[in-house]
Amino acid sequence: MEPAMPEHDGDHASNPPHGVGIPNDSAGIVQTIEQARSEGHTHEIGGGEEGSGHERPAGMGALLAVLGVVYGDIGTSPLYALQSSVSIVSSPKAPAQPWEIMGLASLTFWALMLIVTIKYVILIMRADHDGEGGIIALMSLAQRVCKSQHFRWLFGLVGIAGTCLFFGDSIITPAISVLSAVEGIETSVPSASHIIIPLAMVVLVALFSVQVLGTGKIGKAFGPIMVCWFSVLAILGIKGIFLYPHILLALSPTFALEFIVLHGYLSFIALGSVVLSVTGAEALYADMGHFGRAPIRKAWLFFVLPSLTLNYFGQAALLIRDPHALSNPFYLLVPHWAQIPMLVLATFATVIASQAGISGSFSLCRQLIQLGYLPRTRIMHTNASEEAQIYLPSLNWILAFGALVLVLAFRTSSALAAAYGIAVTGTFLCTCVLAMVVFRRVFKWKSATVAIVFGFFFIVDSIFFSANVLKIPDGGWVPLAIGIISTIIMTTWKRGRSLIAARQQADSMPMGSFLARLPQSRTIRVPGLAVFLTANPDIVPNSLLHNLKHNKVLHDHILFVTVENLDQPEAERGHRAIVQELAPNIHRVIVRYGFMEMPNLPRALLELNALGVAFDAIQASYFTSHELVVRSRVPKMQLWRMWIFLFLLRNAASTTEFLRIPPDRVVEFGVRIAI
């Protein structure tokens, strides 16, 4: 007996670019698991990369690591933030007045206090997802506690929008950071101004070229360099404050309020530059899973915040004493003899800041792949002992190309600042919206408390975002364009994969029917172990049906394996896989991975031996299906989105590579699917 075959086209056994789909909606899987548990036929095992969400101690080593990775972006903002703000109220004929400079210094300080200290360090960092932070973790928390499918979709869209803006930020950060650092050449050697752009491009090319080596070894030096950087910031700030000690009065919010009231619309424009002082605040939350709350909080409160405040106030004091210092107040705080060493230190600091954004993009992209929002791509591990240290070649060179184009197009850090703020404030808004849901539904805050606390921050974030919307014609369109394009790509991929899964469900044979007919089958059984990968554990994989059609045989031992992507950072320890016996020598295996984990299917399956289910990695053969997608007569996707989806599908990495299956153990069949 051979079960009926669905329509197909172009059967082949090769290594195509994309393999079996991995489900994103786990409803069917969970139902299968719970049913199996109730029948007493399941076993749960470990097997895979495990992690821990427990709080980490805030020792000196942890604090150094935090300074080297987390605070690079926000720590290099003094290079350009205050200069950009004061430039708005200054002109060659009418330099900024002391009260205006004090007002902007006060606005900068209170932006650091409200957005970074209170919103992120005190509040948002409480909302961890099994120890992990970041907007993806926050989105997963919000979706988990929401019963309405409509709101789940809405919160997913908010999370994806914030994520896409982060990608835009990751392109702009290396460009503006490196540019602002090398612009110091013009201060110490004015005749060398013509080499600023070429030098910035050389630094950027070098930065992205060494990504393939990983940050394991050089990362150990990041912490001490940033300790030196923040110490120098504080020392320079104190030096500047002695020029005009009254600048410390700007710690009072009355100066900020006075500036807003007296300047009206101009103060609204200035807020678009003030927000540059808090770029990188999202990194505190995103890196919480790597370092824990305590080291990040202590480093901010006792070292980073004081250093930044002193430097901003020192620059402001210098500008009050010498309005002509507006050309570059940061470097003009530095004694002439130390400007070249400071240029070198600033370049190192900006490279570290850029490195943090690039590494964060790699990690975020991996999470999105696991959640099904992006196609699989080649992921390289740069450190055999550190699972989190990864390199994505395709993403790396997309970021590099974008950063180089921005340097050539904008040419100065002050011009590029217009493109920077809107990505940062957009991410702030998305995080605030998701936090409202999490603090109300997860932490059980009263509705009134949530409305007052996060309503206030939503208003603050909205004001900053609106101020940056004014910059759209001057460069603010860049991160918006990147965000819109990224959102279209992610939603198109998600939609396309769901259409494929629905079509496979409609065309496939139920697993129960296959098992019921198997005892009466005359199909020849051959020695060996066959692993059939399937996105849906309730249906017979197309790869098995094609194997029956072409080879007329079944193996003695069969495993139907489904890889389930969880909406949590890691699978629970001891709950990596669930095994259910369907028939003699036929088992269903569901292997689960969180969005922070890298799948390793052969490693997980080796653990089956402990439960009496024989698995020999040398003898196992893996059978997968490759979808040959075409447009149906009644298409469910617009033509332009279909083109995008097919392009992504053609360039996606294979299942073999993504699940780390040995290529020489794989047999793959092509299946034609119309959507």
Swiss-Prot record:
Among its keywords, does the record have Transmembrane? yes
Q: Membrane topology for this entry?
A: Multi-pass membrane protein
What catalytic activity does the UniProt entry give for this protein?
Answer: K(+)(in) + H(+)(in) = K(+)(out) + H(+)(out)
Its keywords, alphabetically, are: Cell inner membrane, Cell membrane, Ion transport, Membrane, Potassium, Potassium transport, Symport, Transmembrane, Transmembrane helix, Transport
| UniProt-recorded Gene Ontology molecular function terms | potassium ion transmembrane transporter activity; symporter activity
| Chain intervals with Basic and acidic residues compositional bias | 1-12
**Transmembrane residue ranges:** 62-82, 104-124, 153-173, 195-215, 222-242, 255-275, 300-320, 332-352, 390-410, 419-439, 450-470, 472-492
Subcellular location field? Cell inner membrane
| Primary residence | membrane
Give the CC-aspect GO terms: plasma membrane
Outline the segment boundaries, as ranges, of region: Disordered.
1-25
Role noted for this protein: Transport of potassium into the cell. Likely operates as a K(+):H(+) symporter.
Q: Which family does it belong to?
A: Belongs to the HAK/KUP transporter (TC 2.A.72) family.
- Write the protein's name: Probable potassium transport system protein Kup
What is the primary gene name for this protein? Answer: kup
